[in-house]
Amino acid sequence: NNNARLMFGDGTQLVVKP
């Protein structure tokens, strides 16, 4: 998909949809 995904060390996932 076109989403930008960042995975943090604590396991939290941030998904950014433009």
From Swiss-Prot:
Q: Which UniProt keywords apply?
A: Adaptive immunity, Cell membrane, Immunity, Membrane
Mainly localized where?
membrane
BP terms from Gene Ontology: adaptive immune response
Q: Where in the cell is it found?
A: Cell membrane
* Top-level taxon of origin: Eukaryota
The answer to whether UniProt assigns keyword Transferase to this entry is no
Keyword Membrane in record: yes
Q: Which residues form a coiled coil?
A: none
GO cellular component terms attached to this protein's record: plasma membrane
- Quaternary structure annotation from Swiss-Prot or TrEMBL: Alpha-beta TR is a heterodimer composed of an alpha and beta chain; disulfide-linked. The alpha-beta TR is associated with the transmembrane signaling CD3 coreceptor proteins to form the TR-CD3 (TcR or TCR). The assembly of alpha-beta TR heterodimers with CD3 occurs in the endoplasmic reticulum where a single alpha-beta TR heterodimer associates with one CD3D-CD3E heterodimer, one CD3G-CD3E heterodimer and one CD247 homodimer forming a stable octameric structure. CD3D-CD3E and CD3G-CD3E heterodimers preferentially associate with TR alpha and TR beta chains, respectively.
Query: In UniProt terms, what function does this protein have?
Result: J region of the variable domain of T cell receptor (TR) beta chain that participates in the antigen recognition. Alpha-beta T cell receptors are antigen specific receptors which are essential to the immune response and are present on the cell surface of T lymphocytes. Recognize peptide-major histocompatibility (MH) (pMH) complexes that are displayed by antigen presenting cells (APC), a prerequisite for efficient T cell adaptive immunity against pathogens.
Q: What is this protein called?
A: T cell receptor alpha joining 31
Q: Which gene encodes it?
A: TRAJ31
